[in-house]
């Protein structure tokens, strides 16, 4: 359901846990952008 690394995205929430949407692709992040305030 969620998107893994290198998959296209437009929002952090589209990416799997501990991943952020940067430059249109999901990328791993230790902070996990999915919990952004």
UniProtKB/Swiss-Prot annotation:
Cystine residue pairs: 2-16, 9-21, 15-26, 20-33
**What residues bear 6'-bromotryptophan in this entry?**
34
Location(s) in or outside the cell: Secreted
UniProt keyword terms in alphabetical order: Bromination, Disulfide bond, Gamma-carboxyglutamic acid, Ion channel impairing toxin, Neurotoxin, Secreted, Toxin
Keyword Magnesium included in the entry's annotation? no
The entry's cellular-component GO terms read:
extracellular region
Chain positions found as 4-carboxyglutamate: 13-14
Supply one GO molecular-function term. ion channel regulator activity
Q: Which Pfam families match?
A: Toxin_19
Tissue-specificity statement: Expressed by the venom duct.
User: Which family is annotated?
Assistant: Belongs to the conotoxin I1 superfamily.
- Name the job this protein performs: Causes hyperactivity, circular motion, convulsion, urination and death, when injected into 13- to 15-day-old mice. Causes gasping, backward swimming or swimming in a vertical direction and death, when intraperitoneally injected into goldfish.
What's said on domains?
A: The cysteine framework is XI (C-C-CC-CC-C-C).
Designated name of the protein: Conotoxin r11e
Organism, as annotated: Conus radiatus
């Amino acid at each position: 359901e969620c998107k893994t690394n290198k998959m296209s995205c437009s929002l952090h929430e589209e990416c799997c846990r501990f991943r952020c949407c940067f430059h249109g692709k999901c990328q791993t992040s230790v902070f996990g952008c999915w919990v952004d305030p």
